[in-house]
Amino acid sequence: MAALGNVLILAREELIAALLGLMVELRGLQPMFLKREESVTEALTRLAFDAVVIDCDHPDCTGDLLDTIRSAGAVPILFSPSRMQAEVREVAVRHGIRSFTLPTDPDTFGRMLEA
């Protein structure tokens, strides 16, 4: 399996975003974050992303956004630092996407990023 390249991280908390960014780097990938005052849609047109890791409680996390991410050619990956794994998985299955919960280990996270 080939690894993904640029990974956009959309987390509600900066500390969580930084942690995920480090885990992305450990896989040899490039973590990316929204610029100040930038919308997710603007970021998706600014750069090509192979994956978007998005907190299921992020204010922009909607079915429409997940469709937009796919339309941009990226793989949406849903996560949560606070919800139960079954709860997040249920939403992910409904949208046909990957998911994980925190805490997670680098290998499990890395498998989410494999194409």
Region roles according to the model:
Residues 22-24, 43, 91:
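Alpha-helical interaction/dimerization surfaces of two-component signaling modules
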Residues 27, 72-73, 93-96:
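Short, structured coil segments at secondary-structure junctions
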Residues 35-51, 58-59:
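Acidic, metal-coordinating helix/loop segments flanking the phosphotransfer/catalytic sites
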Residues 77-115:
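Output/docking surface of receiver
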Residues 3-6:
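Phosphate-coordination loops involved in phosphoryl transfer and adenosine-cofactor binding
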Residues 13-32:
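Two-component/phosphorelay signaling modules centered on CheY-like receiver
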Residues 17, 50-72, 81-88:
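Conserved phosphotransfer microenvironments
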